[in-house]
C-alpha cells in the first residue's frame, strides 16, 4: 500500500476513483489550434448553438464571484457535433473529479483550460448519461451537494495498541469541526511534521470514514483531494513526478483552495473565451 493518510483498508477498494468523464471516449488534452483547421471550420458552420453559447459563458464569467453560486448551462439536448465542438473548444484543464450523489447518480467533472468553466456529466447507476452541463463556478455545485449530508462530528473507540498521536489528532479534528463556519480559513494538520504510526493512520481512517468526492489537480505536480466521511474534513496529498507523497495533510474547511478557481481566474477566462469567439466563431 502507498504511504499517506488516504489508503483503502486491506481488502477494500478505494471509495471513489477519478475516471474518464461520461459515456463517451475519455477527454484528452486538446490544443485550441484545432479551431484553425478546415475540419473545425466546417463544424463551426454547422454548430450555431455552440457559437451562441460561448458569449453567454463569457458574460457569466464577467460577473461571477468566487463565493457566489455558479451558473449552469444545459447542453444535454445539443446535437452531437455541437457537444464535440464544445469539448474541443473548452479543452481539459488542471482539475477533474467525481462526486457520488443520491440514487446512484455520479457527477463527473472536468475543468476547462479556462479556469472556472467546468464540464459536468451526470450518469446513473448503470453509467448512462442523464445530463450534460457547462458550469461557471469556483467549484461545481455537485461537490457541495454530495458533501451536504455528511455528519459534522466524529466518533471513535479507545486508542489501539501501538498508537502514538492519533487521539490528540482526533480531538483537534473534532474541535475544529465543531467550531468551523463557512468562510473560516482552512485549518491544516500536516502529517509530514510529526510521527504517526501505521496503527495511528489505520485508526484515523476508520474514525473519519470515506467520503463522496475525489478531486485531482494537476499543475506543477499532482494534488489529490478526497472528502472524508466527516463534514468539512478533507485529505489533501501532494505527489511528485514519481507518484510519491511529498506532503500529506488533512484540511478542515469547506473545500480545499487547491481545487477552487480564484476571482482573477474568472476575468482571465472571460478574456480568453471572448478572444476565441472573436477569432473563430463570430
Curated annotation (Swiss-Prot):
Q: Give the Pfam families listed for this entry.
A: HupH_C
Q: Which UniProt keywords apply?
A: Nickel
Q: Which InterPro entries match?
A: HupH_C_sf, HupH_Hydgase_express_prot_C
Q: Which top-level group of life is the source organism from?
A: Bacteria
Q: Which family does it belong to?
A: Belongs to the HupH/HyaF family.
Q: What does this protein do?
A: Not known. Could enhance the incorporation of nickel to the hydrogenase.
Give the protein name, as stated in the record: Hydrogenase expression/formation protein HupH
Amino acid at each position: 500500500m502507498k504511504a499517506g493518510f488516504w489508503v483503502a483498508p486491506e481488502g477494500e477498494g478505494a471509495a471513489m476513483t477519478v475516471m474518464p468523464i461520461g459515456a463517451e471516449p475519455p477527454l484528452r488534452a486538446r490544443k485550441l489550434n484545432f479551431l484553425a483547421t478546415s475540419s473545425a471550420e466546417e463544424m463551426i458552420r454547422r454548430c450555431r448553438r455552440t457559437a451562441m453559447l460561448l458569449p453567454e459563458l463569457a458574460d457569466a464569467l464577467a460577473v461571477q464571484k468566487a463565493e457566489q453560486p455558479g451558473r449552469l448551462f444545459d447542453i444535454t439536448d445539443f446535437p452531437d457535433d455541437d457537444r464535440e465542438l464544445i469539448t474541443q473548444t473548452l479543452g481539459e484543464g488542471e482539475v477533474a473529479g467525481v462526486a457520488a450523489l443520491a440514487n446512484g447518480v455520479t457527477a463527473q467533472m472536468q475543468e476547462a483550460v479556462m479556469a472556472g468553466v467546468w464540464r459536468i456529466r451526470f450518469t446513473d447507476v448503470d453509467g448512462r448519461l442523464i445530463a450534460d452541463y457547462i458550469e461557471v463556478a469556483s467549484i461545481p455545485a455537485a461537490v457541495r451537494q454530495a458533501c451536504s449530508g455528511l455528519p459534522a462530528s466524529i466518533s471513535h473507540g479507545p486508542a489501539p495498541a501501538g498508537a502514538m498521536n492519533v487521539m490528540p489528532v482526533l480531538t483537534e479534528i473534532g474541535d475544529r469541526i465543531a467550531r468551523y463556519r463557512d468562510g473560516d480559513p482552512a485549518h491544516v494538520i500536516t502529517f509530514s511534521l510529526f510521527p504517526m504510526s501505521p496503527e495511528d493512520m489505520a485508526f484515523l481512517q476508520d474514525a473519519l470514514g470515506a467520503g463522496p468526492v475525489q478531486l485531482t489537480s494537476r499543475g506543477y505536480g499532482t494534488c489529490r483531494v478526497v472528502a472524508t466521511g466527516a463534514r468539512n474534513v478533507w485529505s489533501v496529498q501532494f505527489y511528485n513526478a514519481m507518484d510519491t507523497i511529498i506532503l500529506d495533510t488533512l484540511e478542515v474547511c469547506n473545500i480545499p483552495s487547491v481545487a477552487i478557481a480564484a476571482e482573477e481566474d474568472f476575468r482571465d477566462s472571460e478574456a480568453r473565451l471572448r478572444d476565441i469567439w472573436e477569432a473563430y466563431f463570430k
